[in-house]
Regions:
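Internal nucleotide-binding/catalytic subdomain
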Residues: 1-70, 74-77
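Short glycine/serine/proline-enriched coil/turn segments at secondary-structure junctions
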Residues: 3, 164-165
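Short beta-strand-initiation
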Residues: 4-7, 67-69, 124-126, 144, ...
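Pocket-edge structural micro-motifs
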Residues: 23-26, 84, 131, 159-161
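Short, flexible active-site loops
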Residues: 32-42, 84-97
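Active-site "cap" helix and flanking loop/linker of ATP-utilizing ligase/carboxylase catalytic domains
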Residues: 49-70, 76, 86-135
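PAS/PAS-like sensory domains across diverse signaling proteins
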Residues: 79-81
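Glycine-rich active-site loop/lid that clamps phosphate-bearing ligands
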Residues: 123-124, 131-164
Length: 165
């Protein structure tokens, strides 16, 4: 495996060209499917700066307006490989709803309607866990352990009500 780290950058570009960048996150995958995003990522300053430079270059190349998610691999020899660029709010950034001063959704709207971008600062360390239903399940959503999770101080659960897994 070439990757030692899968950093995630969320950035938003406004109509006037201002760019707001969220704290770097660490995406963790199981069987190539996002399992969790941990913010802030536990990485060294040099790797963070290199990945941040790569994310900014991607933003310049795309020259778009609104939210962008840039996922990348950083190899053992610190080579940066872009894995995905999503020009939209992204499931990796759902942590921003409670974890940051301004969510990715609010900043996306601000950007496309010409309002100043909001503060992207992290309020507190945050983990977003991607809950997926059993393959082939259809019908009402049931989350095992929901009561226990909701009893945790600071925990929030978002259930999107998709009809089919």
């Amino acid at each position: 495996m070439i990757s030692v780290w899968k950093p995630l950058f969320l950035a938003c570009r406004s109509l006037n060209g201002d760019v707001a960048v969220y704290p770097v996150g660490d995406n963790r995958h199981i069987d190539s499917i996002l399992h969790e995003t941990v913010v802030p990522a536990d990485i060294d300053k040099t790797a963070t700066e290199g990945a941040m430079d790569a994310a900014k270059k991607v933003m310049e190349i795309f020259d778009g307006i609104g939210m962008f998610c840039v996922e990348m691999f950083v190899t053992e020899d610190d080579q940066i490989l872009i894995n995905e660029v999503a020009p939209r709010p992204h499931n990796s950034g759902h942590y921003t709803i409670e974890g940051c001063v301004t969510s990715q959704f609010e900043n996306h709207i601000r950007a496309i309607v010409g309002l100043p971008l909001g503060d992207t600062s992290l309020i507190r360390p945050t983990v977003m866990v991607n809950l997926l239903g059993e393959e082939g399940h259809s019908g009402k959503t049931y989350v095992e352990g929901l009561y226990d999770v909701c009893a945790l101080k600071g925990a929030t659960v978002h259930i999107y009500g998709k009809g089919v897994s």
